[in-house]
Amino acid sequence: SNTKAADIAYYGAGMAYLHLNQYQDAIAYLNEFSASDDLLGALAKGALGDAYAELESYDKAMASYQAAIAHADNEFSTPIYLKKAALLAYQTNDFSKAKSFAETLKERFPDSPESVNIDGLIGLASK
């Protein structure tokens, strides 16, 4: 178990590497991070999903987005990762899963920025 300072350092380094497009390094640091804060934990898991998606490790990306959704149910991060999961599912031709994530987003967070234009994705995934 890491100290709180070490955890924040791992998170910060992981996010920095993610923004530098150094995805393997981002994954290494974010995997060392253990959150005591629910929101930060969700953001770290979501960032892992982004890194895995960039590396085309789509199964790991989806698992990370689902972990982010489950980690902290809130109006800030949950809609973000529901939309990312829906888009990833659509991109990987899992249309029923894409539709499910998109519909959950629309039903649970209708006023979130991520819900804007979500009907388009639901329509595409329904074909």
What are these regions, as identified by a protein language model?
Residues 1-6, 20, 34-42, 70-77, ...:
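Short solvent-exposed coil/turn linkers within tandem alpha-helical repeat scaffolds
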